[in-house]
Amino acid sequence: YWSDMNKKLISTIVNLDNFVLKNRMVNATLVAMQQTLPLLAICVYVQLMSHLILSPNALLVTLFNWHLRIPADIQLQEMLSLLEVFVLMILSASFTKHFLSMRKIAQTTLPTLTNFLGTYFLFLGKGQTPTYDTSQYLLVILLSFISCESFYFYQKFVSGDNPQPFAVRFLIWAALILLIDVALHFAIQR
């Protein structure tokens, strides 16, 4: 009895795993995460060094009563924030390129550039140095997915065969996506 139940459970898990891995969104996310992993590792190590040594209330500074004078602490925090946003921008661009390639779209330059810039507009504001967590990666993937699907359907139903990649109708689409990202920026920052 237990062996039959275990076989059914394992078979169900394998089928579910195969279904998830064949999903375009999951596959593009995995490829994008693999491509951004080296940059993400650098970002994590730089953040770790900052929190252990470089910030005024760092762990090692507090434990050993060091009196380090970091003249550009605010600029360092802004640079770390920019590095985090840059990782998110690369993730968005990589996801867009791979997802649209799986959808058999040859001209991916404009949507990739649009999502790259959209991520920048979404997360950076004038004079702000926000901190991010892993939910930001999910938000970037979700917004990139919605943008990619809108581009796919816009190209398929509006432009027809052999579209020019930077035609006015696609530039209007890109401007609309960027305006949505800017509006979401203000909604998130409230």
PLM regions and their residue ranges:
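Hydrophobic alpha-helical transmembrane segments of multi-pass membrane transport/permease proteins
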Residues: 37-49
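Perimembrane loop-to-helix junctions flanking transmembrane segments
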Residues: 55-75
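Solvent-exposed, non-transmembrane amphipathic alpha-helical segments
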Residues: 49, 53, 65, 115-116
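Membrane-helix interface motif
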Residues: 48-60, 185-190
